[in-house]
UniProtKB/Swiss-Prot annotation:
The modification Phosphoserine is found at residue 112. The gene is Prdx2. It comes from Rattus norvegicus (Rat). This is Peroxiredoxin-2. It catalyses: a hydroperoxide + [thioredoxin]-dithiol = an alcohol + [thioredoxin]-disulfide + H2O. Its main location: cytoplasm. One of its GO terms (biological process) is negative regulation of extrinsic apoptotic signaling pathway. SUPFAM superfamilies: Thioredoxin-like. The modification N6-acetyllysine is found at residue 196.
């Protein structure tokens, strides 16, 4: 896996590329999404086995993310033509069917390399997931090995948690969900949380 240029708390590496959006090819840039949160997820290859389960799950929850002012973008090293062929394949045959999220082509592998998820020996991406805030700052990175898919619910929860901390200045404990107690991040005020939960 390459080291990449994606670092927590720093601006996310910008990119421009061709994506399949609503069944058509479209040039997109990360900077197009400034002012919104972005969940950028990499997956190994089209026409595989775990990948469609993740992509369909993210697509099926796209509106949940949009309600939070967040867009979801999928990326693999496949071409936009392969993405389109997979989208045009019915789900019952291992295809994706119509999607509610863009799939970005990274045929040069530069995006995977830049984000540090390129599996050099195979020329494919690990299952990297990056949460980028409305200012373009990278807030979260997770990278799974190839055989295990990611949780869309956890990605949604993380976006909600980062947005909450940005708005309220409090921090979110393990397993936090919207409506749960948070912690005031100083020694004295944090005792309110700890006395209630211990």
């Amino acid at each position: 896996m390459a080291s990449g240029n994606a670092h927590i708390g720093k601006p996310a590496p910008d990119f421009t590329g061709t994506a399949v959006v609503d069944g058509a090819f479209k040039e997109i840039k990360l900077s197009d999404y400034r002012g919104k949160y972005v969940v950028l997820f990499f997956y190994p290859l089209d026409f595989t086995f775990v990948c469609p389960t993740e992509i369909i799950a993210f697509s099926d929850h796209a509106e949940d993310f949009r309600k939070l002012g967040c867009e979801v973008l999928g990326v693999s090293v496949d071409s936009q033509f392969t993405h389109l062929a997979w989208i045009n394949t019915p789900r019952k045959e291992g295809g994706l069917g119509p999607l509610n999220i863009p799939l970005l082509a990274d045929v040069t592998k530069s995006l995977s390399q830049n984000y540090g998820v390129l599996k050099n020996d195979e020329g494919i991406a690990y299952r990297g997931l990056f949460i980028i805030d409305a200012k373009g700052v990278l807030r979260q990175i997770t990278v799974n090995d190839l055989p295990v898919g990611r949780s869309v619910d956890e990605a949604l929860r993380l976006v909600q948690a980062f947005q909450y901390t940005d708005e309220h200045g409090e921090v979110c404990p393990a397993g936090w969900k919207p409506g749960s107690d948070t912690i005031k991040p100083n020694v004295d005020d944090s005792k309110e949380y700890f006395s209630k939960h211990n």
